[in-house]
Amino acid sequence: LSPALHHGGFVTCEPCDVPVSKRHLDMLLTHMTLSDKPHLGAITEMSRAQDSVDMAEIIFGQDAMENNCVIMGNVNTNSPLLVDKVVTQAVRVYCGRGQGIVVVPFILSGAMGPVSTAASVAQAVAEAMMVCAYSQLGRNGAPFVLGNFLSSMSLKSGAPTFGMPEPVISNYAIGQLARRLGLPLRCAG
């Protein structure tokens, strides 16, 4: 309800007193009834992704869902260069119904990706484009958002080093590549 916030995300608060098998339903219902902001749906299991899309159809109707993106899923690749069953199933559910998917390669340079900024950016774009191509097999023209979470790590301690200049440079580079590819961009950090 704040004018400064444009999106509700998905897990605003994890209701740990609700069984895991039903938790996503309560979180979705809360977003749908207590907020006027767009939000993400569940992606952790195919059935939860399906529940998210089905609940969105109850709210918006089948015709609106056929012609509009009313809910999106946010998935991560398993760097380096791996897309697991959970991600592929979520992509099939959302994109198969014409709904959007945000793909965010999560890469800590030096751990799950190359040390250099340019090589990490190349890996992130390759992983995201792999999922983009797969999403279009589910439904040609399905909405796709290029995501990015590139950070660095201390090669001395192995600890993530948030706030370093390399991730900012990566965001700029991926932003330019997203613009060239004609894709909307979501960056973390």
Predicted ranges, named:
Residues 2-189:
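Helix-rich catalytic cores of soluble enzyme domains
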